């Protein structure tokens, strides 16, 4: 059994900061669960281009309000607390935060914890060995 406290992740290498977000990575590939779990804060007033070509992601919003737009078709989904969205087709998307948003993100395959978005919004596949 593994128990991870958010307070033990904050300020470590498992807390990764981007221009628009902070990702506290709670479970990683090394934990052997087959997925990774992140507690992520998206900053109010930002737009983030994301395209997980190598990962599927489910995102549960626990605080805040924003929207997700799929680039392929321009469809926009409002997102608020207590809603989940799943990027089940490696959807290229824009995440816009109207307020600070706190999200619980689950990735498959799991990330190693070293990843950050590249210029296309992609997390590369990283071997942590």
From Swiss-Prot:
GO biological process: ectoine biosynthetic process
Top EC group: lyase
Catalytic activity: (2S)-4-acetamido-2-aminobutanoate = L-ectoine + H2O
InterPro entries assigned: Ectoine_synth (IPR010462), RmlC-like_jellyroll (IPR014710), RmlC_Cupin_sf (IPR011051)
Pfam families for this protein: Ectoine_synth
Pathway assignment: Amine and polyamine biosynthesis; ectoine biosynthesis; L-ectoine from L-aspartate 4-semialdehyde: step 3/3
Keywords: Lyase
Keyword Transmembrane: no
EC number: 4.2.1.108
Gene Ontology terms for molecular function: ectoine synthase activity
PANTHER family named among the record's database cross-references: L-ECTOINE SYNTHASE, PTHR39289
Function description: Catalyzes the circularization of gamma-N-acetyl-alpha,gamma-diaminobutyric acid (ADABA) to ectoine (1,4,5,6-tetrahydro-2-methyl-4-pyrimidine carboxylic acid), which is an excellent osmoprotectant.
Family of this protein: Belongs to the ectoine synthase family.
Protein name from the UniProt record: L-ectoine synthase
Lineage, opening ranks: Bacteria, Bacillati, Bacillota, Bacilli, Bacillales
């Amino acid at each position: 059994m593994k128990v991870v406290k958010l307070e033990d992740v904050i300020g470590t290498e498992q807390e990764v900061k981007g221009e628009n977000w902070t990702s506290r990575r709670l479970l990683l590939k090394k934990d052997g669960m087959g997925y990774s779990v992140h507690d992520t804060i998206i900053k109010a007033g930002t737009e983030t281009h994301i395209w997980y070509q190598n990962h599927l992601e489910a995102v549960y919003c626990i605080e805040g309000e924003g929207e997700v737009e799929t680039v392929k078709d321009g469809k926009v989904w409002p997102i608020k607390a207590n809603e989940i969205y799943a990027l089940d087709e490696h959807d290229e998307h824009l995440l816009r935060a109207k307020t600070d948003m706190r999200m619980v993100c689950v990735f498959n395959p799991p990330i190693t914890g070293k990843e950050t978005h590249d210029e296309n919004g992609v997390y590369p596949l990283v071997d942590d060995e």
